[in-house]
Amino acid sequence: MSAAEPALAPLSPGAPVLVAGGGITGRAVLAALRRFGAAPTLCDDDPATLRGYVDSGVDTVSTSAAAERISRYALVVTSPGFAPTAPLPLAAAAAGVPVWGDVELAWRLDVAGHYGPPRRWLVVTGTNGKTTTTSMLHAMLTAAGRRSLLCGNIGSPVLDVLDQPAELLAVELSSFQLHWAPSLRPEGGAVLNIAEDHLDWHGTLADYAAAKARVLDGRVAVVGLDDSRAAALLSTARAPVRVGFRLGEPAAGELGVRGGQLVDRAFADDLTLLPVDSIPVPGPVGVLDALAAAALARCVDVPASPIAEAIVSFRVGRHRAEVVAVADGITYVDDSKATNPHAAEASVLAYPRVVWIAGGLLKGASVDAEVARMASWLVGAVLIGRDRREVAEALSRHAPDVPVVHVVTGEDAGMDATPVVFGANVTKVKHLGGDLGAAVMSAAVAAARDLAKPGDTVLLAPAGASFDQFAGYADRGEAFAAAVRAAIR
């Protein structure tokens, strides 16, 4: 371990370390630092959170006070929610105090042998499809009899699983986590796609893409070639092995589709993996997710048979293109996890005729190009949430014949006073102290049912975050499912 010690500097036994954020990530960081022998102090903006840690014997401080005394600490380990422009990271940078994320800490401790023989990390990132792809990858590794752990932005933090025996880690990472993990060098890393998202955190699309590209600095870089922004990252990847995947026929060094089969020409001359029609995730997005997962599995020598076995038995996660009901010839699909325009477009394109329930918080992203590409799939739209006007304006430009209904509430960020655009229908929701999200979704589903005909799909694929009207994307999806069940009863 002594040879690996420099990788841990400035972390050392007894070193004062500031842990920024007291959520799930913060708890995992505290446990790891205590195990290592460091002297952690936790900061958070929520007094109730701090009181809970004080009761557990943890030294605590407010975030503002921590920023004022930042030079007392040898290191800051931050939760991914802290943007680099937040006062605390800025104070650390000005004082020359390094800032790591929890993934950076996990990577350095693992490489240093702190948890035994280092694992081989297989990392998935991208604007959309991360969770499905990582879950597929883990299933492939498990089907091959390999000891794999699923972690990161899905399930448990990486730090929470490192004390479990494993050869491989199937890791989903967000752009926030990757920004704070500059030394990460995985065995294999995949960038599925790049679209406008989290620009309020990163500042620019270039900075967002640069964070995603960090997974390409290990041994094998895997990139979705059908996405121009992602494909552009392959030429600058540091990985010595570079692999692309596409929906079309693969060239040498790629995975793709030929004759209705997924084919590997990167890790074999010409290896058939599985039939496209065995992939349970609908539409092109399901094929792309399976190709990316297969590429990472193949980079650690998983044969074709367990890859096919894993896909055939794979089940889509909750709120990810989940069919919640079929009634009167209309299919109701919950894709509440489609929290940005790129994801919503992929979801809409999986079905031939769609009544689209959309809206929420766009986080600075434009929806115009995506609406233009999906316009011919839409037979109706029901718009909810704070940023629904932007969606409505895109629909008026690119799908002017598609009927649009606005669901308006008094609590909807003052949107009652906003002029209704282009003569759209309006459903007003009166919120009398009950569940606002449930009321909104009940009205949205009722409007969508009125627009839908047999053979249509009523699709919740919002293109925005949910926090204006819901506790999270899962809460939004549950509200949709409950509203559908009530409507078809």
UniProtKB/Swiss-Prot annotation:
Biological pathway: Cell wall biogenesis; peptidoglycan biosynthesis
GO biological process, one term: regulation of cell shape
Enzyme class: ligase
Major localisation: cytoplasm
Pfam family, one: Mur_ligase_M
Cellular component, GO, one term: cytoplasm
Record protein name field: UDP-N-acetylmuramoylalanine--D-glutamate ligase
Source organism (scientific name): Mycolicibacterium paratuberculosis (strain ATCC BAA-968 / K-10)
Lineage: Bacteria, Bacillati, Actinomycetota, Actinomycetes, Mycobacteriales
Name of the encoding gene: murD
